[in-house]
């Protein structure tokens, strides 16, 4: 697991209040981790801050799972 993967999983667990063991690459923020739309907005903001990037609203809507977040951050940093 890369340091980016690990940090994203830590942020997801912290933002959504779930155990890090639940944060698998395949986990959907809403379906598997119990996030609502506000949680996902806050999660995107935390990722933007951590990785010093800006995620457009259009792209943010496409980030639905942990793997989506990893792929996006990896491609944009």
Curated annotation (Swiss-Prot):
It comes from the Bacteria. The modification O-(pantetheine 4'-phosphoryl)serine is found at residue 37. PROSITE patterns: CARRIER, PHOSPHOPANTETHEINE. Its main location: cytoplasm. InterPro entries: ACP, ACP-like_sf, PP-bd_ACP, Ppantetheine_attach_site. Residues 2-77 form the Carrier domain. 4'-phosphopantetheine is transferred from CoA to a specific serine of apo-ACP by AcpS. This modification is essential for activity because fatty acids are bound in thioester linkage to the sulfhydryl of the prosthetic group. Pathway: Lipid metabolism; fatty acid biosynthesis. GO terms for cellular component: cytosol; membrane. Keywords: Cytoplasm, Fatty acid biosynthesis, Fatty acid metabolism, Lipid biosynthesis, Lipid metabolism, Phosphopantetheine, Phosphoprotein. It is found in: Cytoplasm. GO terms for biological process: lipid A biosynthetic process. One of its GO terms (molecular function) is acyl binding. Carrier of the growing fatty acid chain in fatty acid biosynthesis. Belongs to the acyl carrier protein (ACP) family. HAMAP family: Acyl_carrier. NCBIfam families: acyl_carrier, PRK00982.1-2, PRK00982.1-3, PRK00982.1-4, PRK00982.1-5. This is Acyl carrier protein. It comes from Geotalea daltonii (strain DSM 22248 / JCM 15807 / FRC-32) (Geobacter daltonii).
